[in-house]
């Protein structure tokens, strides 16, 4: 930053700017916020403003640009949405009364995590600011808040990966750290698009000391202290709406890592990156902003407590049984504004008259909502009824004080009702009488002078004036009119009578506006005292809203109440993918069963591409998530256990940021499942091993299946194109083969989308290529090659996986962060002679070329090592690491 001290004002600017070097400084000058120097150059580009200069005659003129103060919020939003900070510097005294330089201070630092003006587009989204600290024990403290609602939660988390997963789940834009957080983790967070801010010293505030009352460990007190201090320092205003910190345990909810949430398209469509086409989109029939935010929170954290799940189910069932009452409830909820964020604006001091009318309107719906819930006559809603506090004293106070349609700004006056305050009424009478007197004076002066177009007006510079066109100036008396302003075609004058009346009117206006603002602040403080009650009411209404949303979608899409079982039996009858069904229409969707009893843990799924294998897998995961949210599910009947975790590997996506290949990402996601899954988990693996050479992939796929079967025992859906693996059902007793049906009709492939028992008999790959529109000659050539390959396979026994010749795996530039512990895997696996013949002892990888090139010494060495490898005695991660080493040797 080029420091400029040509004037006292620029010296003041630079002194303030030095305190906020990483932020745009919006420096108030009159009716504009100005930016100077580098801020102006960059800001003009980002905000599409005209770049000008200050001190044109100077040797080095100062770049500057500005935005009008009345429109400043929109410009702040643009910068913050792009990941910048904005320091708002205000004039702290009236420039007219200032002696010397006007005093200025930064009144707020707006950052991605502290932005509270979310607008309509963000009404149903939380904006979380997160803090992170590290204890000597290696455990992380994590706390987050949404400043617009006052929500504040904290947790202790072990491991960097778990921390990153939690941050991504929260979709946090900004993380506040202290010195305990290592630079490596800071860089990983930055790579994920999070702004890193620092806050080392903790400051205590008596106003909000209550937030730590329920914290029982030093780690949690430390991280909440860091978070609250940062908010206090940057926002510089009341935070009375911050709620007591709630300690939560991530293990108390169904765990899904970020990859699984992404693969399942819970809240963001993989293709469009938008809400449409997601499970959240399907389930969202909420009528309030609060309900919309709570729905997403429930979706992010499904329950694992059976009693809590069944309590939600019971309330959804009750709402389903009462159609008319449910409709009445929806009509009432539509009239409820965002109580949480209204309460936040009250605490911040940014609430206006229209906000208070919205609050009043919302509170007036509560008695109607109470009546509707009472009409249900369902005991499961007793707690809800007890929490429906209408906060009638606040509603009454607003109704008595505020006009029904107040102006946007309190400073403009006209917000307080007539009759509310006697002194205010007197000032207003003086103003009204004065304006009546002005109208009478105008008529009188026209009559006396004979000037019909004479008029009385007002502006902020000259006050009240009498305006006469120049052609009529000769008609004015010479002794009564005092010239005030000359215009092109007219002159403006004053008279002694007009001056006196102007003084009285302006004095009344000034006192009226000041008194009105004082009365408004008193009302705001009265509402502020009820913030806790308003927040509790908001929570009850939000919960009601989500439950009625569940009831609506359950009725509209013919969902059923799932039965939760204590064992491991899973039985979904005629299950459906809810989002695909909504897009296609119910008549076009083919439902399928999923049956896995206590003796079946793995379904090995085969079938052609595009036949619906991935959809089948996703629909089971979505059914589980919906059930554990408390919603009904898309099926004719459903029985299921309560799952503790869901792991998925569906689809292929390179991690370009960290330089990891598709295969490495695939192995890492698979490893997370193998490392952390329990017998109560659900695993979905789609085409594991396809990212590497054929036999490498097949070997890994088989080893992973065996590992899950023999060690993990989780319910698993595993789709594959390796048809040799279907023979595993002979040795793995808890594995069953199923396939997606397809038939050939007149040379064309017809997908049945129906899951059938047993393995698929063909892969139909060339048929799928035909459906994709591949050239006819290419398809004909593929048929010839396929025939040759099949004949070669029939004539040559295939080599065992331990002796197979395979190409090295794709490059992987980063090591796996956590690994499956290999503790005598061979001891837990079946003996080699008892294994399925999925990979026989003499198989060799087929070549599309008749003449194989001569091997280099390095290639020959790798081939020798492959032939000596004992695949059955290795973990999946050990295999992957060995393949990675070979790849490094072959690419040198």
From Swiss-Prot:
Binding-site residues, ATP: 607-614
Q: Which InterPro entries match?
A: DNA_mismatch_repair_MutS, DNA_mismatch_repair_MutS-lik_N, DNA_mismatch_repair_MutS/MSH, DNA_mismatch_repair_MutS_C, DNA_mismatch_repair_MutS_clamp, DNA_mismatch_repair_MutS_core, DNA_mismatch_repair_MutS_N, DNA_mismatch_repair_MutS_sf
Which stretches does the entry tag as region Disordered? Answer: 796-842
Name the source's superkingdom: Bacteria
Keywords carried by this UniProt record? ATP-binding, DNA damage, DNA repair, DNA-binding, Nucleotide-binding
Question: Can you list the GO cellular component terms from the UniProt entry?
Answer: cytosol
Q: Name one GO molecular function term.
A: ATP-dependent DNA damage sensor activity
Check the record and name the PROSITE patterns matching this protein.
DNA_MISMATCH_REPAIR_2 (PS00486)
GO BP annotations of the record are: mismatch repair
Alphabetized CDD domains for the sequence? ABC_MutS1 (cd03284)
Compositional bias, Low complexity, is annotated for 796-830
Query: What Pfam families does the entry give?
Result: MutS_I, MutS_II, MutS_III, MutS_IV, MutS_V
What the record says about family reads: Belongs to the DNA mismatch repair MutS family.
Record's function text: This protein is involved in the repair of mismatches in DNA. It is possible that it carries out the mismatch recognition step. This protein has a weak ATPase activity.
Protein name as it appears in the record: DNA mismatch repair protein MutS
Species of origin: Levilactobacillus brevis (strain ATCC 367 / BCRC 12310 / CIP 105137 / JCM 1170 / LMG 11437 / NCIMB 947 / NCTC 947)
């Amino acid at each position: 930053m080029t420091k400029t001290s040509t004037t006292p004002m620029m010296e003041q600017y630079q002194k303030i700017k030095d305190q906020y070097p990483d932020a745009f400084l919006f420096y108030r000058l009159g009716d504009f916020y100005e930016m100077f120097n580098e801020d102006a150059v960059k800001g003009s580009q980002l905000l599409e403003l005209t770049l000008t200069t200050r001190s044109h005659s100077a040797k080095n003129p100062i770049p500057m640009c500005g935005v009008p103060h009345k429109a400043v919020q929109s410009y702040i939003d643009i910068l913050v949405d792009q990941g910048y900070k904005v320091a708002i510097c205000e004039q702290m005294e009236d420039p007219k009364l200032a002696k010397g330089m006007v005093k200025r201070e930064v009144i707020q630092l707006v950052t991605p995590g502290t932005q509270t003006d979310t607008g309509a587009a963000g009404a149903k989204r939380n904006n979380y600011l997160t803090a992170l600290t590290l204890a000597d024990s290696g455990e992380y403290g994590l706390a987050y808040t949404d400043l617009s609602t006052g929500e504040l939660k904290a947790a202790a988390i072990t491991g960097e990966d778990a921390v990153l997963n939690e941050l991504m789940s929260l979709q946090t834009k900004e993380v506040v750290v202290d010195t305990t957080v290592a630079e490596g983790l800071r860089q990983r967070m930055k790579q994920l698009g999070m702004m890193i801010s620092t806050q080392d010293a903790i400051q205590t505030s008596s106003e909000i000391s209550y937030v730590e009352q329920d914290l029982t460990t030093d780690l949690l007190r430390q991280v909440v202290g860091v978070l609250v201090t940062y908010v206090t320092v940057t926002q510089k205003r009341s935070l009375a709406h911050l709620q007591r910190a709630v300690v939560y345990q991530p293990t108390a909810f169904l765990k899904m890592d970020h990859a699984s949430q992404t693969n399942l398209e819970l809240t963001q469509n993989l293709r469009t990156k938008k809400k449409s086409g997601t499970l959240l989109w399907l389930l969202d029939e909420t009528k309030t902003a609060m309900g919309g935010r709570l729905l997403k929170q429930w979706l992010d954290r499904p329950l694992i407590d059976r009693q809590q799940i069944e309590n939600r189910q019971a309330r959804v069932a009750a709402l389903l049984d009462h159609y008319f009452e449910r409709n009445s409830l929806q009509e009432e909820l539509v009239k409820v504004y965002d109580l949480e964020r209204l309460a936040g604006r009250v605490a911040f001091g940014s609430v206006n008259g229209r906000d208070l009318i919205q609050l009043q309107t919302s509170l007036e719906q509560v008695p109607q909502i109470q009546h509707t819930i009472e009409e249900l006559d369902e005991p499961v809603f007793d707690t809800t009824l007890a929490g429906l506090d209408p906060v009638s004293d606040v509603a009454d106070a607003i109704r008595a004080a505020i006009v029904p349609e107040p102006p946007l700004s309190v400073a403009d006056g006209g917000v307080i009702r007539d009759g509310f305050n006697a002194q205010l009424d007197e000032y207003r009478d003086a103003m009204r009488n004065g304006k009546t007197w002005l109208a009478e004076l105008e008529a009188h002066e026209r009559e006396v002078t004979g000037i019909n177009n004479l008029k009385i007006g007002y502006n902020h510079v000259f006050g009240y004036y009498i305006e006469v066109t120049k052609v009529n100036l000769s008609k004015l008396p010479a002794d009564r009119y005092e010239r005030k302003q000359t215009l092109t075609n007219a002159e403006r004058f004053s008279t002694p009578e007009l001056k006196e009346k102007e003084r009285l009117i302006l004095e009344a206006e000034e006192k009226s506006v000041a008194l009105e603002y004082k009365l408004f602040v008193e009302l705001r403080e009265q509402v502020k005292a009820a913030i806790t009650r308003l927040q509790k009411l908001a929570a009850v209404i939000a919960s009601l809203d989500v439950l009625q949303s569940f009831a609506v979608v359950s009725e509209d899409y013919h969902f059923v109440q799932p039965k939760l079982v204590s064992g491991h039996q899973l039985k979904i009858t005629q299950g459906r993918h809810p989002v695909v069904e909504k897009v296609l229409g119910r008549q076009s969707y083919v439902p399928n069963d999923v049956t896995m009893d206590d003796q079946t843990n793995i379904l090995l799924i085969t079938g052609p591409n595009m036949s619906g294998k991935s959809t089948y897998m996703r629909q089971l995961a979505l059914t589980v998530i919906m059930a554990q949210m408390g919603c009904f599910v898309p099926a004719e009947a459903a029985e299921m256990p309560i799952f503790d975790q869901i792991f998925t590997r569906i689809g292929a996506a390179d991690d370009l940021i960290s330089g990891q290949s598709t295969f490495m990402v695939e192995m890492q996601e698979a490893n997370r499942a193998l490392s952390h899954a329990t017998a109560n988990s659900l695993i979905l693996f789609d085409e594991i091993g396809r990212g590497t050479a054929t036999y490498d992939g097949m070997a890994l796929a088989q080893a992973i299946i065996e590992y899950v079967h023999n060690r993990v025992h989780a319910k698993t859906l595993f789709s594959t194109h390796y048809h040799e693996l279907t023979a595993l059902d002979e040795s793995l007793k808890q594995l069953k083969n199923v396939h997606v049906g397809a038939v050939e009709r007149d040379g064309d492939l017809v997908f049945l989308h129906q899951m059938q028992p047993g393995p698929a008999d063909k892969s139909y790959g060339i048929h799928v290529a035909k459906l994709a529109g591949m050239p006819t000659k290419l398809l004909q050539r593929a048929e010839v090659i396929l025939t040759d390959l099949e004949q070669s396979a029939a004539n040559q026994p295939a080599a065992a996986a331990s002796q197979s010749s395979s190409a090295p795996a794709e490059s992987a530039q980063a090591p796996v962060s956590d690994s499956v512990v290999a503790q005598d895997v061979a001891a837990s696996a079946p003996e080699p002679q008892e294994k399925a013949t999925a990979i026989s002892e003499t198989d060799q990888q087929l070549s599309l070329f008749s003449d194989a090139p001569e091997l280099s010494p390095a290639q020959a060495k790798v081939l020798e090592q492959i032939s000596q490898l004992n695949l059955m005695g290795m973990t999946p991660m050990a295999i992957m690491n060995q393949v990675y080493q070979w790849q490094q040797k072959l690419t040198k």
